[in-house]
Structure formats: C-alpha cells, structure tokens
Curated annotation (Swiss-Prot):
InterPro entries xrefs: Ribosomal_uL15/eL18, Ribosomal_uL15/eL18_sf
Gene3D superfamilies associated with the record: 3.100.10.10
UniProt keyword Ribonucleoprotein present: yes
Name of protein: Large ribosomal subunit protein uL15
Highest rank taxon of the organism: Eukaryota
Organism of provenance: Tenebrio molitor (Yellow mealworm beetle)
Length: 148
C-alpha cells in the first residue's frame, strides 16, 4: 500500500489548490475534444492534421472487398502444411491412413495441380480446385472432400 499523500490532501488549507487566483482554473476553456478545429484551434489542425476536414472522391456504397482474393497453393507444396511429427507418423502407416489437410484453415483458398502427389492424403478441398488435381490424389489412394 502506498503511503504517500495525494496532492489533493497536501493542498488542504491552500485556497486555490495550485490553480492560481487571477487566471483561475476553469473547466474546459477550449471546448471538449476536437471542438473548434475550424475556429479557435484552426492553426493546430492546419499544421498537424492537414486534410482532417472536407471530402475527397466518390463513395461506393456496395463495394465488395477481396472478391478476387484467393491465395493459391500447389499440390506439390501440400505437405509443407503438415507438421514434421504428423508427417513421420503417417509416412509408413500400416493401415494406409493419411492426415486430413484443411487448406482453408491454413489460409489458402485455391488449390492448383502442379507437381505430383507422392503419398496418399485426405484433403478438405476448397471450392477453387481443378478436376485433374482430384484425379492425381485419387490415383495415389487419397481422398478429396469439398469443404467450402
């Protein structure tokens, strides 16, 4: 527990509490917050916040952001999404089990078919993927399930 007195306690008995007598400590002399940016605080706003007031350009009300944003990953890079432990666990699995890879969870929304699929894997496939890619995975003994 702090034992030092607060300033208000120290100033008991001193009439003006350190705010002078003639100028006086008034409540909000310049207004609250950003008040007066166009008037009595104009110099500060023009100097340190240019462009704060006014409009620029046209407003698009129905803007669809990131409609074309779909990061892609190739088939030959799929195993980089799996940790080293999981890779070694499923490498020579006696029952031929394979890890399930969710590429959407890893941040990719498009799967491309470059490269070869060397071992079987279960894949949660995104909506952007190629048919020949599915054939490559099934040829090795894997499975593709549509996720999104």
């Amino acid at each position: 527990m702090s034992t030092h007195k607060k300033k208000t306690r120290k100033l008991r008995g001193h009439v003006s509490h350190g705010h002078g007598r003639i100028g006086k400590h008034r409540k909000h002399p310049g207004g609250r917050g950003n008040a007066g940016g166009m008037h009595h605080h104009r110099i500060n706003f023009d100097k340190y916040h240019p462009g704060y007031f006014g409009k620029l350009g046209m407003r698009n009300y129905h803007l669809r952001r990131n409609s074309k944003w779909a990061p892609a990953i190739n088939l030959d890079k799929l195993w980089t999404l799996v940790s080293e432990q999981t890779r070694s666990k499923y490498q020579n699995h006696p029952e031929g089990k394979a890890p399930v890879i969710d590429i959407v969870k890893a941040g990719y929304y498009k799967l491309l078919g470059k490269g070869a699929c060397l071992t079987n894997l279960s894949l949660l496939k995104p909506s952007f993927s190629l048919n020949r890619l599915e054939d490559k995975i099934k040829a090795v003994g894997g499975a593709c399930v549509l996720s999104a």
